[in-house]
Amino acid sequence: MSGQTTSEYISHHLSFLKTGDGFWNVHIDTLFFSILAAVIFLFVFSRVGKKATTGVPGKMQCLVEIVVEWVNGIVKENFHGPRNVVAPLALTIFCWVFIMNAIDLIPVDFLPQFAGLFGIHYLRAVPTADISATLGMSICVFFLILFYTIKSKGFKGLVKEYTLHPFNHWAFIPVNFILETVTLLAKPISLAFRLFGNMYAGELIFILIAVMYSANMAIAALGIPLHLAWAIFHILVITLQAFIFMMLTVVYLSIAYNKADH
């Protein structure tokens, strides 16, 4: 952080590479690393799928099989309907979010400095620390909730659910509609902000630890064990947040698909 104050250093690391100003702008770094994470996921799983063998599997095949069976077991326990779409969706969500989260383990200065060699002055590499990315994913989940609700109950069932629940009387239709709308909207919003909040906080802590290296020798020496300890703990955080996003998606879709009347 030579030539920068602490506040300038932190502000620089929290600035996006973007086009445009104001609300209507595109975070190029978020898009790039989101797509990169998806490509890594597709490459690894397609490669393992092509080389899958009934004999003694390799380490990567074992890992992929464990993850697939684990996710399929979770979907089987929580989603009581056809799993041909939900199970692959859950697997994709978990692996994709995990890979995006794992980018946070790369030292905070490495990627921005590398990008600086190509004249790129701002770069945030963790897509899930960008609220626009997490909101985008949660909005997709929101539309899937509506789709599975209509698929299982029909459009009339959807209208009935949002007008006659929890109070089954025509006089309470406005109250029911407000309550159910708030409940429905709270699902994608909570999904987005939970993932964003945890990853943003994790990224900020890494940046604050990096600031310690520019202080005196005693504080800089303290930063090394702190960095290592937080990185180890953060492995749990990135895995847990990927699991929570996947799990809540499956649960929300299961509730939407439930054919039983309330």
UniProtKB/Swiss-Prot annotation:
Segments crossing the lipid bilayer: 26-46, 86-106, 130-150, 204-226, 240-260
Membrane topology: Multi-pass membrane protein
Domain of life (superkingdom): Bacteria
Main location: membrane
Entry GO MF terms: proton-transporting ATP synthase activity, rotational mechanism
Family of the protein in this entry: Belongs to the ATPase A chain family.
Stated name of the protein: ATP synthase subunit a
Organism: Haemophilus influenzae (strain ATCC 51907 / DSM 11121 / KW20 / Rd)
